[in-house]
């Protein structure tokens, strides 16, 4: 992939621009606030270009008081960089998270202020993978309880008879970098590998040595289940009473990814009733872990979020993020910006209005497609077809496509690489003959669940409009919560959907129907004020005339 367009920082989105920044540095040393414990090697890198103040344990109010004097903040997981802090940081140019997750940073607020947010997506990969494997082995061989027993001067060999992992089935939920490394080591240990990841191709799974299956089969067949997925609305409480009931009574669950993916109360019930064989958890819905019955069970291992807590990982993430902060303060690109692409000012001026459009359409077709995606086609239409450097738009579309599955792990720098690793073929086409708008984008996602497409354009005031979905003409702005229905164009169907939504207390903000012929197929696009409650989408698909329904979050 040609990354020439990344050689200049997106100064069009930043304030001040590069020349002003360099003049600023000639007279005044930049200042960096380090608000959490960071390895000294990272601080030393920052000191090459800035005055560094290490102030840990500050409250939000305390940070708000001092942040106006800083050009950058470097943090780990303890500090919460809220919208209020960002608004107070009038000089902030970059916020760096020494780790993978950026859920403790208000990224949209930072983006609105033109502040770059960076992370270290690979710095703790090995540490997190090894911790998951260690938890699996500790669970299989009762190591924590056996250790405690011997230290109490006991010798209870029969009580701690374990199980081998050799020839057992490991179910890996999420085959990103961490999940793939876990799978590779487990394969070397002689384990059979099942995996679920809707964004991984079978070819990539074959390279890792996994058999791709659906979640139901994975849950029912696996002896050990390890989770390596971000927390999203779709993955929250993925492990719940219903999914636990599908597992073997000897199944053991390992979660070293994100808290909130497991319904902890349901897990307590499953452990208490011997519905599953055990669990090893490094992350929790609320941290630090408060009152919890999980502490009561000998077959539950708990650690205090140690996935990235190795000397090597702490050095890796500190160096990675400190170097990016240094580079941005010098007017250079950040290699792992999660919110802003690295564009030169002239390219940014032309394409900036369309980046959000491309990302929005990518998010839309990704959610409509649902299953694993094999191909993404991005067509630049009208005036956009004349741009020679259109690569940023393609990357923005990929970022949107993968955003629901990967969240903070996908950014403008790594989006194309993430797509390639998942076996997604990206095709760019151009069609200057389309003149419905001065410039528009058409995206088509093809995968295991079929093919879905969407077209969008910008109004003269810069507002985004979705102009067709699955080749049905519409004209609607994107909304946080949206519902799309494919149905037969017939009297009464709109009223039925409206009544059904109303019965669940879901308010409709706007609605539009697109059709090609009278009484033929049609699509309904509804913007909602509220997310759909559990079970409502299924009820909608039961309405006579409804052929399919999709809920989308934009």
From Swiss-Prot:
Gene Ontology BP annotations: L-serine biosynthetic process
PROSITE patterns with a match to the protein in the record: ACT (PS51671), D_2_HYDROXYACID_DH_1 (PS00065), D_2_HYDROXYACID_DH_2 (PS00670), D_2_HYDROXYACID_DH_3 (PS00671)
Entry-linked Gene3D superfamilies: 3.30.70.260, D-3-phosphoglycerate dehydrogenase, domain 3, NAD(P)-binding Rossmann-like Domain
CDD domains on file: ACT_3PGDH-xct (cd04902), PGDH_4 (cd12173)
Keywords: Amino-acid biosynthesis, NAD, Oxidoreductase, Serine biosynthesis
KW Amino-acid biosynthesis (keyword) present: yes
Binding site for NAD(+): 177-178, 197, 256-258, 282, 305-308
One family name in Pfam for this protein: PGDH_inter
EC number from the UniProt entry: 1.1.1.95, 1.1.1.399
Cell membrane as UniProt keyword: no
Catalytic residues (UniProt): 258, 287, 305
NCBIfam families for the chain: PGDH
Family the entry assigns: Belongs to the D-isomer specific 2-hydroxyacid dehydrogenase family.
Physiological role: Catalyzes the reversible oxidation of 3-phospho-D-glycerate to 3-phosphonooxypyruvate, the first step of the phosphorylated L-serine biosynthesis pathway. Also catalyzes the reversible oxidation of 2-hydroxyglutarate to 2-oxoglutarate.
Protein name listed in UniProt: D-3-phosphoglycerate dehydrogenase
Species this chain originates from: Synechocystis sp. (strain ATCC 27184 / PCC 6803 / Kazusa)
């Amino acid at each position: 992939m040609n990354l020439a367009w990344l050689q200049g920082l997106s100064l069009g989105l930043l304030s001040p621009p590069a020349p002003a920044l360099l003049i600023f540095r000639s007279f005044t040393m930049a200042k960096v606030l380090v608000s959490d414990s960071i390895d000294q090697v990272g601080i030393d890198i920052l000191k090459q270009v800035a005055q560094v103040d290490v102030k840990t344990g500050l409250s939000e109010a305390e940070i708000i008081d001092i942040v106006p004097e800083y050009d950058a903040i470097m943090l780990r997981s303890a500090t919460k960089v809220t919208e209020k802090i960002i608004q107070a940081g009038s000089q902030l140019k970059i916020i760096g998270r020494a780790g993978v997750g950026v859920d403790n940073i208000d990224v949209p607020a930072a983006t609105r202020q033109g502040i770059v947010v960076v992370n270290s997506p690979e710095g703790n990969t090995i540490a997190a993978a090894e911790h998951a494997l260690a938890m699996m082995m500790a669970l299989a061989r009762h190591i924590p309880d056996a250790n405690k027993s011997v230290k109490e001067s006991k010798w209870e060999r029969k009580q701690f008879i374990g199980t081998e992992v050799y020839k057992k089935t490991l179910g890996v939920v999420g085959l990103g970098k961490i999940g793939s490394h876990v799978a590779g080591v487990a394969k070397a240990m002689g384990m059979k590998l099942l995996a679920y990841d809707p964004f991984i191709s079978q070819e990539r799974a074959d390279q890792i040595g996994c058999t791709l299956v659906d979640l139901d089969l994975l849950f029912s067949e696996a002896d050990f289940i390890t989770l390596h997925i971000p927390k999203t609305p779709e993955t929250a409480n993925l492990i719940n009473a219903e999914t636990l009931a599908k597992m073997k009574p000897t199944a053991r669950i390992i979660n070293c990814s994100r808290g909130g993916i497991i319904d902890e109360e349901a897990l307590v019930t499953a452990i208490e009733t011997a519905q599953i064989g055990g669990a090893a958890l490094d992350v929790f819905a609320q941290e630090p872990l408060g009152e919890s019955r999980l502490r009561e069970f000998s077959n539950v291992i708990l650690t205090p979020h140690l996935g990235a807590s190795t000397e090597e990982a702490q050095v890796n993430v500190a160096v990675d993020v400190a170097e990016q902060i240094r580079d941005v303060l010098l007017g250079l690109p950040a290699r792992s910006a999660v919110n802003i692409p690295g564009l030169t000012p002239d390219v940014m001026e032309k394409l900036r209005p369309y980046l959000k459009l491309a990302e929005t359409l990518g998010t839309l077709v990704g959610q409509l497609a649902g299953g694993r995606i094999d191909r993404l086609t991005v067509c630049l239409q009208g005036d956009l077809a004349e741009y020679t450097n259109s690569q940023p738009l393609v990357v923005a579309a990929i970022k949107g496509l993968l955003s629901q599955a990967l969240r903070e792990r996908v950014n403008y720098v790594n989006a194309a690489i993430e797509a390639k690793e998942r076996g997604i073929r990206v095709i760019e086409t151009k069609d200057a003959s389309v003149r419905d708008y001065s410039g528009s984008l058409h995206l088509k996602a093809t995968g295991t669940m079929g093919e879905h497409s969407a077209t969008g354009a910008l109004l003269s005031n810069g507002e985004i409009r979705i102009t067709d979905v699955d080749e049905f003409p519409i004209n609607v702005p994107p909304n946080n919560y949206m519902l799309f229905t494919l149905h037969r164009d017939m009297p009464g169907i709109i009223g039925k959907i409206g009544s059904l939504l109303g019965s669940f207390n879901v308010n409709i903000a706007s609605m539009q129907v697109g059709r090609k012929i009278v009484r033929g197929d049609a699509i309904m696009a509804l913007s909602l004020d509220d997310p759909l409650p559990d079970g409502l989408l299924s009820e909608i698909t039961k309405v006579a005339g409804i052929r399919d329904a999709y809920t989308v979050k934009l």
